[in-house]
């Protein structure tokens, strides 16, 4: 049975979701990992497969190859800017974003970048496009900062997203996570999204929960995984139960099946 909860995105509601998170979480064992690997191996692929919650929410629709856009870059730059502010309280959000942008451009000028990296992409933009990227990053930082300011429990910005390579299945999983809250024995993860949630946002949240647990060396799931849509004023949450972990894993495998069928039809 799913533990999906739907709430208005208010400071009080978010803090209540954090405080009421279960004290006991489920744990994924080596047997669970082996079972997931076998399921993915049964879905043949000619190339390395990369899956995340967004693909699950899009029902496995074909996607374009990755390329940087201001909307994608804003999360990386905006979060890095917030880390700067945590160490230097005298910085404003806009100044922190500009400093982060300048560091990337300096890295490219010094020749320390590779083709396809964020720094490489930024170095090829016009001044107008760089201004757009900066504005998007400031917006992301401001929105995230407002969420952080309302939290009543100790928090930290996630060091990275969760990544898990499925053994012998040519499949990589990526789970988004933005804020980690550790409260006694609880670990609550917050994921921020722009726009508004759709009908498949719950399954997407369960996928991020499952990938986060798979990426953990101990396999222990977060007590609660909270998705926040500040623009829409909505937040959803799922608990780290075995039922939700299995549901998230099943949805990832289903997405791989849908993608395989699409590739077969395209090749026919």
Feature-to-residue mapping (PLM):
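Active-site catalytic microenvironments for nucleophilic, acid-base chemistry
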Residues: 79, 84, 211-217
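Charged, glycine-rich intrinsically disordered N-terminal tails and low-complexity linkers that flank
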Residues: 1-108
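Short acidic (Asp/Glu) and glycine-rich catalytic loops that position anionic groups and cofactors
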Residues: 52, 56, 81, 185-192, ...
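Non-catalytic protein-protein interaction segments used by genome-maintenance enzymes to assemble
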Residues: 161-208
């Amino acid at each position: 049975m799913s533990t999906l909860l739907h709430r208005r995105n208010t400071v009080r509601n978010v803090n209540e979701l954090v405080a009421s998170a279960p004290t006991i979480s489920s744990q994924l064992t080596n047997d669970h990992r082996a079972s997931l690997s076998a399921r993915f191996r049964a879905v043949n692929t000619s190339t390395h497969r990369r899956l995340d919650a967004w693909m699950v929410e899009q029902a496995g629709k074909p996607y374009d190859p990755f390329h940087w856009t201001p909307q994608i870059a804003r999360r990386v730059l905006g979060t890095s800017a917030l880390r700067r502010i945590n160490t230097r309280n005298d910085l404003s959000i806009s100044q922190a974003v500009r400093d982060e942008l300048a560091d990337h451009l300096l890295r490219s000028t010094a020749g320390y970048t590779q083709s396809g990296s964020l720094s490489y992409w930024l170095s090829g933009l016009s001044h107008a496009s760089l201004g757009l990227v900066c504005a998007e990053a400031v917006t992301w930082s401001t929105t995230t900062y407002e969420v952080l300011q309302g939290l009543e429990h100790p928090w930290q910005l996630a060091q990275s997203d969760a990544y898990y390579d499925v053994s012998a299945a040519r499949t990589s999983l990526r789970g988004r996570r933005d804020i980690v809250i550790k409260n006694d024995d609880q670990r609550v993860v917050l994921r921020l999204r722009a726009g508004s949630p759709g009908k498949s946002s719950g399954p997407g949240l369960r996928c991020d929960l499952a990938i986060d647990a798979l990426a953990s060396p101990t396999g222990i799931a977060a007590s609660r995984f909270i998705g926040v849509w500040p623009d829409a004023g909505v937040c959803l949450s799922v608990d780290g139960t075995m039922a939700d972990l299995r549901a998230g894993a099943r949805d990832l495998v289903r997405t791989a099946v849908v993608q395989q069928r699409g590739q077969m039809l395209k090749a026919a």
